[in-house]
Amino acid sequence: MGKEKTHINIVVIGHVDSGKSTTTGHLIYKCGGIDKRTIEKFEKEAQEMGKGSFKYAWVLDKLKAERERGIQIDIALWKFETPKYYITIIDAPGHRDFIKNMITGTSQADCAVLVVACGTGEFEAGISKNGQTREHALLAQTLGVKQMIVACNKMDSTDPPFSEARFGEVTTEVSNYIKKIGYNPKSIPFVPISGFNGDNMLEPSANMPWFKGWSVERKEGTMTGKTLLEALDSVVPPQRPTDKPLRLPLQDVYKIGGIGTVPVGRVETGILKPGMIVTFAPQNLTTEVKSVEMHHEALQEALPGDNVGFNVKNISIKDIRRGSVASDSKNDPAKETKMFTAQVIIMNHPGQISAGYTPVLDCHTAHIACKFAELKEKVDRRSGKKVEDNPKSLKSGDAGIIDLIPTKPLCVETFTEYPPLGRFAVRDMRQTVAVGVIKNVDKSEGVGKVQKAAQKAGVGGKKK
């Protein structure tokens, strides 16, 4: 079998009718985890419904419908394989909770595929002030998705079809915009494709002889290719943050007869091992880890990305809960957050947001109301430069630097130190009204409770 391929996560973004579903569906269909029987079933249904031209988008619609109805569809359907990687599509917009998912994200995307439609008039609509192309690209940038691929789709419907001039125009315009928000266009492959007909998806297209291929310059060197598949293979795999101190936000806490209290969550940074002395924030409780398990097997160490359960001594199920964060008591332990400063982008709020506004924040697994205590500055969301001090209010489309105060104990971190614990979604009226990135955290130096087991191991407190 040889070496297992590396896994990477991508998020597919772009305006509503840019052809995201068709393009994604095409990749899954051609390289992916959908078995022949399922495809034949979908094709038959499509013919019966007179949607013969459906092909790929139909596949995705079926998957989406099942996902939204809460049917646990085989997640393999959202995976596909390239010569170099196993790729998982962690989400695609169009979902009600897309933005929230992308932020509290069960996983961080390694690369965003921005799909833009090149058809006459379509591109302009997508990148206009109220199109989603800009919003999604900005969101990807804000949330720390460092790499991007631009798929210039619907090349078959340019005027004339497969127009080199149109591809040039779209490339220039998109480059200018993404440069403003902080991406380097030189490091981004721009691929002219037809997600529907398959041009330049997996094989070079005969319809665009003028396209000599894409070329990108990155610190890893120059890479070239012709197709979208090759562009995906040019993604630089992520470095797992094992060298950072441990942060593990709890998803749940169970009480298991004969074993005791078992917190469950995903290691975001660092390493968790049996015998380690961990501190839970914001509760400030310290105790020893007896054992660590994943998929019912004991682990000697859990690494970033691993979903694990671990057994802790002398801590009751009432002491800790979802949203608590486990950390290494001897290496930058997590603490309760008194106040934090964040750069916030208001996305869709019907009115003005001013000091005193107290919506719910979703940050890692925590879900807690926080008060916008002070609007410190309004910034240009494209350049990040300050445009006004102490603004009275912020409205949709604005970005600002804000001080927030949690209404209940909470533990968050700065985005630069611990990215998964430093980005959040602001929820109100059942939608995501804003997203934010934490710049600075004021931590409380509370006196904690150290369990007997941990005292023996020589942590805090006087030995009795």
UniProtKB/Swiss-Prot annotation:
Instruction: Determine if Phosphoprotein is one of this entry's keywords.
Output: yes
**Which keywords appear in this protein's UniProt record, sorted alphabetically?**
Cytoplasm, Elongation factor, GTP-binding, Nucleotide-binding, Phosphoprotein, Protein biosynthesis
Q: Which GO terms describe its cellular component?
A: cytoplasm
Concerning InterPro entries, the annotation shows: EFTu-like_2, GTP-eEF1A_C, P-loop_NTPase, T_Tr_GTP-bd_dom, TRAFAC_GTPase_members, Transl_B-barrel_sf, Transl_elong_EF1A/Init_IF2_C, Transl_elong_EF1A_euk/arc
Compartments where found: Cytoplasm
Query: Can you give the residue ranges of the tr-type G domain?
Result: 5-242
Q: Write out the GO MF terms.
A: GTP binding; GTPase activity; translation elongation factor activity
- Which residue positions does the secretion signal occupy? none
- The record lists GTP as bound by 14-21, 91-95, 153-156
Keyword RNA-binding included in the entry's annotation: no
Known function: This protein promotes the GTP-dependent binding of aminoacyl-tRNA to the A-site of ribosomes during protein biosynthesis.
Into which family does the record put it?
Belongs to the TRAFAC class translation factor GTPase superfamily. Classic translation factor GTPase family. EF-Tu/EF-1A subfamily.
- What protein does this entry describe? Elongation factor 1-alpha
What is the originating organism of this protein?
A: Onchocerca volvulus
